[in-house]
Regions:
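Hydrophobic alpha-helical segments, chiefly the membrane-spanning helices
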Residues: 1-331
C-alpha cells in the first residue's frame, strides 16, 4: 500500500515537473527560431501544461484502465471549477471577462455535453457497449481547432500577448525538452500503476481513484496558479485558465487519447458527467449573481465586471465536498 501510494505521488510530481520543463525548453526553442510570443502561448504553453492529463489518459487507456482514463478528465473538470475556483474566490473576488462569460464558459459546457453524447452509444444508438471511438476522437479535434481559432482571434483583438519567455541555448533547451518528456512518460506510468494498485488494495473502483486523487493531482497546476493569482490581486486570469483547461481536457486530450486507443465508458460515469455539466452551469450562474461596481463622481456607479464572490466560492466548495461524499458512498 505504501509503495503504491508512493508511486502515485511520485508520478503526479513527475508529471507536473515534466510539463514545466517541457514548456520551458519548447518555449525557449520557439523563441530562438523567431516564433512570436502569441503563438508560443497558444501552442507550446497551452499544450505543454495539458500533458499530465494527456499522458495519464493515454497510459491508462492502453493498459485497459478505462475508468481512470475518463475519470481523470471528468474529475479534473469538476475539480477545476468547484475546488480550484471555489478556493480562489474565497481568497478574493474573482473577476470574469465578458468574453469568458458569453463565449468560453458556454463552450466548456458544450464540451462536456458533447462528451456525454458521444460516450453513450449503448443508450443513443443501442450499441452493445458505449465507447469513444477514433471517429469520436477526430470529432473532438475538429471542435478543438475551432476553439484554437477563437482563442487566437480573441488574443489578437485584446492584445493579450504574453512576454517574458526566456531564450536559452539550443543544447540546454533540447535538454529541457528531452528530460521533460522523459519525466512525463515515467510520471504517467507511475501515476496509472499506482492508482490501479491502490484501487485493488483498498477494494474500490478505478473510477473513484481517477475522479478524485488522480484528477486533483493533475489539477494542481491550475490550483496553484489560481490561488497565487488571487493572492496577488490578479484573480481575473483564474477563470480563463480554468475554463480553457476544461475545454482542452475534452476536445484535445480525449481527442488525441481516443484516436490512439478507443475508450469504453462505464454507465456509472454518466452521473459524474452530469456533475461536470452541473458544475459548469453553477459557474455560469455564479458569474451573473455577483458584480463589481466602480463609483464615478459622487452618486453614480457603473457596473465594472462580472465576479465570482466569496459566497459563491463557499457554495462551490460545499458542492465539491458533497460530490466527494457521493463518490465515497458509491464506492
Amino acid at each position: 500500500m505504501i509503495l503504491a501510494l508512493a508511486m502515485l505521488i511520485a508520478g503526479i510530481l513527475l508529471l507536473i515537473k515534466g510539463a514545466d520543463w517541457l514548456v520551458e525548453g519548447s518555449s525557449s526553442l520557439a523563441k530562438r527560431f523567431g516564433v512570436s510570443d502569441l503563438m508560443i502561448g497558444l501552442t507550446v504553453v497551452a499544450f505543454g501544461t495539458s500533458m499530465p492529463e494527456l499522458l495519464v489518459n493515454i497510459v491508462s487507456s492502453v493498459e485497459g484502465a478505462n475508468d481512470i482514463a475518463i475519470g481523470n478528465i471528468v474529475g479534473s473538470n469538476i475539480a477545476n471549477i468547484l475546488l480550484v475556483l471555489g478556493i480562489a474566490s474565497i481568497i478574493r473576488n474573482v473577476a470574469v471577462k465578458t468574453s469568458t462569460v458569453w463565449n468560453e464558459i458556454p463552450l466548456a459546457l458544450l464540451a462536456v455535453l458533447v462528451l456525454q453524447l458521444m460516450a453513450n452509444d449503448s443508450i443513443i444508438d443501442h450499441y452493445p457497449v458505449s465507447e469513444l471511438s477514433r471517429s469520436d476522437g477526430l470529432a473532438f479535434l475538429a471542435f478543438f481547432l475551432i476553439f484554437l481559432w477563437y482563442v487566437a482571434k480573441m488574443r489578437r483583438r485584446e492584445d493579450e500577448i504574453e512576454n517574458g519567455f526566456v531564450e536559452r541555448g539550443v543544447p540546454v533547451s533540447i535538454g529541457f525538452v528531452s528530460i521533460g518528456l522523459g519525466l512525463l512518460l515515467l510520471g504517467g506510468k507511475l501515476t496509472v500503476d499506482g492508482a490501479i494498485d491502490i484501487a485493488s488494495l483498498l477494494g474500490i473502483s478505478q473510477a473513484f481513484i481517477g475522479l478524485t486523487i488522480v484528477a486533483i493531482g493533475t489539477s494542481l497546476p491550475e490550483l496553484v496558479t489560481s490561488v497565487l493569482a488571487a493572492v496577488r490581486k490578479k484573480a481575473d486570469i483564474a477563470v480563463g485558465n480554468v475554463v480553457g483547461s476544461n475545454i482542452f481536457n475534452v476536445f484535445w486530450i480525449m481527442g488525441v487519447g481516443t484516436i490512439i486507443h478507443p475508450v469504453r465508458l462505464d454507465p456509472a460515469l454518466n452521473a459524474d458527467l452530469f456533475v461536470a455539466i452541473l458544475a459548469t452551469v453553477v459557474l455560469f450562474i455564479a458569474v451573473h449573481t455577483g458584480h463589481v461596481h466602480r463609483r464615478i463622481f459622487l452618486f453614480w456607479r457603473q457596473r465594472q465586471e462580472h465576479v465570482i464572490g466569496r459566497t459563491d466560492g463557499v457554495i462551490m466548495l460545499l458542492l465539491y465536498v458533497a460530490y466527494l461524499g457521493y463518490l465515497v458512498w458509491r464506492g
